[in-house]
Amino acid sequence: MRTEEAAAVLGISGSNASHLLASLQKAGSVLRVTPGRWSVSGQPSPYLVASWLTDPYPSYVSLYTALSRRGLITQIPRTIYVVSLGRTKTVATPVGTYSVHRLPPELFGGFEERDGERMATAEKAVFDTLYLARARGQRFSHLPEIELPADFRPAVLDDWATKIGDRRVRSFARARIADFLAQTRRSSTS
């Protein structure tokens, strides 16, 4: 809940609501997740919190976190990776540490929403990671060993690459996709 929502429900000023929520936090009744955002029902889902951190810009969980949740990698990242239309940043909260990365609007999408949580599809998590390898240098330059599920649709990667406006960036992304698919095919036949 937002501080303003608490103020409206209680019929008090935002300042009084903030003081009341801070007192309730000291008593252990609520958790301050981010400035102006509170959880009244215990520890919120870390994937739900992701959208709070980028508000008013939309976001979804992707990259290594989505790869892990979708079963493509066995490693479980400590950091929760998020893509957004907002700026790139790292945010530490009581729920976890978030690494937010900006995508251009034409590449925003390819996620499923359930109970307010937005999670990239397997294909989009792979695409986002390959795409951001160009912009983020070393951070995403090496993908861990990936096990593609039987229902993985490689053509979706190229569909997303087609949406990249800059010809050089599109060419780089397609080359990364081709290398990735060739490498995973070699790994699966070994």
Summary of predicted features, one role per range:
Residues 40-190:
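Nucleic-acid-binding surface
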Residues 1-58, 94:
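Short beta-edge/loop segments at beta->alpha junctions of small alpha/beta modules
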